[in-house]
Every structure is written in C-alpha cells, then in structure tokens.
Amino acid sequence: MVQTGLEDFPSILYNVVYNDDRKEFNAQKGGFMNFFIVDCFAEEKYQGNELLVLKADRQISDEEQQKIAREINFSETTFILSDKQENGGYDVRIWTPNVGEVPFAGHPTLGTAHVIRNCYEGGGSETVKLNLEVGQIPVAVTEDGMTMSQNPPEFGSVVQRKEIAVVFGIGEDSIDEKYPVQWVSTGLEAVVIPLKSRKALAEIKMNRPAFERYIERHPENYCNHLFFVDMGENMLAARCMMEDFIEDPATGSANGDLAGYLLEHDYFRSQDVQYTVIQGEDMGRKSVLHIHASQNNGDWVIEVGGNCYIVAQGEWE
C-alpha cells in the first residue's frame, strides 16, 4: 500500500490512499467524510466513467452537496446518507456539477453499490439496494460484475432526423430511417438515435447554438442523446452526448433506455436479448456495458451491468 500525503496541495482532497486490497475501509469519525473514486463500466482501472462516492457521516446540506459535485467536476457525484439499510436499502443522492440533483443515473448507481458492498458490508452481499429519488434500485453481483435493474420503459415523442443531423453535425442519411429517433426513459430520459455506420458515430460534433434552438422547440429533449450502431455479433457501439455539452464515457441509464427501445422496435427480432455495448472509445475512456432485456405481455426486464474499480480513497474535509 502506498499513501500519498497532499497536505501542501491547495485542495480539500488529501491523504489519498491507493490500495489494491479494499475489502475493509475503517470509517473515520469527526468532521471528515470518507470518499472513494471509482471507475465504472471499466475493464481495467483508468477506463470507464469516473465517479466520486462520499459517505456522509455528518449532516450535509443540499448546497454543500452541489458544491462538492462542482469541485470534483465528474459527470456525477453520489452521497451515501444512511449507515445501514433503511426501508430495505441505502439512502443515496446523485448530483451533477451543472444540472443539480438527478433522480437516477446508471454508473453512479453501480459504483455506489460497489463501494457499499466491498467497503461497508465486507464483500459478502449478493444484492445491494439503493433508495434513490426514482425509487428503490437493486444491484446484484453477477458474472458481469455488478448488474442493476431499471424501470420499465416509457416512450415519448419522435424527432425528425434532419433536426438531429443539424444539431450533431452528421448527415441526415447517416441516421437509420428504419427506426425512429425517440425519447425513452427507464428512470432517466434519453433521446435514442440509430446510426448506419461506425464512421458516422465518430463524426458526431455537438453544435451549441443549434442545440439551444432545438431545445426551444422540444424542451422535453433537454436530456442525454444516445447514438448507437450495430457492430454485429451482439455488440453495439455507442456515444452519449449530455445536455451540458459534454460527452459521457459510460451511461447506464441511457443504455437502459436503449434496451427498452430495441425491444419496442424489435431491433434484434427477439423479445429476450443479451448484448454488449462499447462506449467512450472516441474519448479515450473505453467502457463495456453488458445488457439483458426482455418483454413478455408488458412485463419488462431491463438489466445493465459492468465492472467497477476503486482507484483511490481518502478523507474529504
């Protein structure tokens, strides 16, 4: 174990511990909170989507939670608010640096459950349940790492391909006309866009003025926009452009939306599918998401899984 003291560094992050054996982490008392930096949906450390998880061992206001999320500036930061399970799960809140609190998000759910299981429950739990604003979300230990169950999908409005082409700098003919561009939510909404080629996926570039005009026309679409292309052999490539003009390297919530979309439009010609999504390659943070989805007479199963790695832990003042 190597411990790095950062006392002279002008930051509220210090005494960061890099440790490959994290089965136990002793909670510190007093005014400090334990924090963990987690790479989610990653095949190894320094890939996937970064997450800051804090264990709130003291009262912490909404204002302070928002300030911490802005300080670390990851796409999301989570706060574990209960020392033990309350109503069958752990109370958790999810914050973004710019949008504020969100009711649900995929990689924060997975990463927070990973921290609870390995650092506070001793690594023995088969399921960790999180009480989120959207409701209780179970996260299970599976052969794919950690797997969360998402809500049944809701389907909203359809968007014209030419509008998406203008906003994201791609040709209208690169969007697959066989399937709609559609708003979907399994807990946190996204607009799902089917593409014809990996080349088109790589060419996406968000046009801020065009996006702002687009949102004026479609305020319900102020959300993630998930682009995907079929790579064959039960594998999709995807990119997710967020509403604050940032690309997300791994988006569990939007991939749950995508799973519902694929079943609704019979994309794989099956109502019980398993496939893998590769996201984040174009930004150097390769992420791997394992999806299982099924639908039978209105009974939906949406499961999104992947591996998580704790890369740092320490105290937050």
Region roles according to the model:
Residues 15, 29-104, 110-317:
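Active-site proximal loop and beta-alpha junction motif in alpha/beta enzyme cores
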Residues 8-32:
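Short, Lys/Arg-enriched N-terminal segments with co-localized hydrophobic residues
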Residues 2-7:
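Extreme N-terminal basic, low-complexity initiation segments
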